Every structure is written in structure tokens, then in C-alpha cells.
Amino acid sequence: MRQRRYRALAAYVGGAATMAGALIAGLISGQVLYARRTIPGAQAPPPQCGGRYGRQYEGEPIALAVLGDSTAAGYGVHTRAQTPGAMLATAVADDAQRPVVLTCTAAVGSPSAWLPAQAENVLDAGGADLAVIFIGANDVTAGVDEEQAVAFLAEAVRTLRAAGSEVVVATCPDLGAIPPILPPLRWLVRRWSRQMARAQRKAVEAEGAYTVPLGELLGPAFDADPDTLFGPDRYHPSAAGYRAAVEVVLPTVLAVLDRAAGRPQHATRPQGTGHRQGTGHRQGTGAVADGAAPVDSSARAAGDPAQTDATKGADADVAGRTPGGAVPCVSQSHSNA
């Protein structure tokens, strides 16, 4: 009699769990459809940012490359100086007191599968002393197999490293911070973002490159202030959001360049430093655009972007290419990131 009761209870619980699972699956499916309707596709290409920066400085130019998706390209901003590539190039030039030649092969909508071609395009444009990659969001939103996505990233890093480039990868952002994505889908997307970032870090560092945990460092700030850090589409960052991303990546970029040049490095590990074993780190300068006011250390520690002044444009005398020979930093599809 008791066994029959247990069996009946188990059947009831199992049935309830199955029903609950079906309801949750249905809810998530509905939220996916809602998010897809709410988040618009890319409407226009971001400003082209490739070119020469820091012309006021003398010496051999530093070759910098930016690869990846819309975060790398700067989708949604209105001026070249607001793009991550321009901000990074200007900061590197100011810090090193040398000119910087920037090649941008990033493309809006890029998954990791496009990275090997982007890396080859960097080499075709003359190579890079340092390459910075922002990637992962489109792989998560498209449900790309994690191992497959990471394999493409590792291939691109390997190609760049074999050509003599140092590489810094900003790993997958926290997509759970995107306002149109609601719970419980938000919880799943956040988990998938973190899993992708962990896998990226492991693969990238195995290739001798450096990583910056973009989601870990910026997710809380975007959660706390979406109106400031997200653009009008509520999916891509605003100019302030891109500035915040540059602020957490910049210290690692500068530290890696210091290490490569044999310059002394500070022992501190500010937000945004990489994780490669034995890397020296130092505080970034905070200067991220020609004519822009530096961001003070308290703003950087809190993850809050500072306001930028009007900035100078760079001379576009270098152009990288995206897969298929397209213009750099332009939309390759109607994907969201």
C-alpha cells in the first residue's frame, strides 16, 4: 500500500515537473520571439575608423588592429572618434607618444566564424603589432555551438600570433543585461554568455594571448544604468557604453604594449586587465580620444563612463577588409550584433 502511494506521488511529481518544464519552455520561446521583434536589425554601417592617429607624434607608427562584431565596429555611434577603434588608437598614441596606424576589419553581425577571414585581412593590410578582438554575442544569440565558436576564435588568434601580433580578446559580453530580454530568458542568456566567456578565455590563453572579461566587468554597470549605456535600440551600446568598454580594455592593451616594448610596468591589476599568467599590468591613462577629457580613476573603478568632448577625426589612409572584401566596420547582414 505504501509503495503504491510512493509510486503515485512520484508519478504526480514527475507529471507536474514535465508540465512545469513545458510551460517554462513555452514562456522562453515566447520571450525569444518578443526579443527578436523588439531588437531591430542593423540599419546603417558605423563610421569607418581605420587610419592614422597621433600625427603630432614622431617615431615608427604602432600598427593596431580591431576585429570582431558590432562592439568592435562601434555600431550606432555617429562619429569616427566615438568608435572603440578610434578611442583605443588615440589612447595608445598618447600613451606611447608615437603615431598609430589602425586597421579595422570588424563587421556588424560577425560571429566567431568570420574571425579567421578578418585576421587574414589584417595581415593583407600589413599586419599589426597588437590586435584587439571583441566577439561572442552573435554566437550566443544564434545558438552556435560553444566549441565550434571558440575554435574559430582560436584559429584567428593563432594566425595573428604566428604573424608576430600580440592579441587581446574582450570576451563575450553579458547579454543578460539587455533590457528587452526578460526573465527567465535573461537568466539563461546570462549563463550562456558566461559559459562562452570562460571557454574563450581558456582557448585564447592557450594560444599565448590575453583576455579581458567584458561581461564580468561591464555587466553590472549596464544593468544599473541601461538608459545611459545602451543606445536607442536598447541592444547595442551607446557612445557612453562603448567608452566604458574601451576603459576596461585599455589597461590591458597598454600593459601588453609595454611588455612587448620592454618598458617597465606597474604591479597593480586594475579593472580590465588580462588573465594571462605572468602578465605585467598597470593603470591605463584614461585618455581615450583626441580632445577628450580623461576619465578619472574613480569613474573607471565604478564602471561609469565620463562625458566626451568634441573630438578630432583621424586621417583614413589605411583600410582593412572584412570577409568577402567588404568595407571595414560595415554591416555584413541584418544580425543584431
Language model region names:
Residues 35-65:
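N-terminal signal-anchor transmembrane helix
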Residues 163-165:
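A short helix->loop->beta-strand "cap" motif at the edges of active sites that frequently abuts
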Residues 63-65, 71-151, 295, 299-303, ...:
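Conserved SGNH/GDSL esterase-like catalytic core that processes O-acyl groups on lipids
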Residues 238:
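Short, conserved phosphate/pyrophosphate- and ester-handling motifs at nucleotide-, phospho-/glycolipid
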Residues 134, 170-171:
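Alpha/beta-hydrolase-fold catalytic nucleophile elbow
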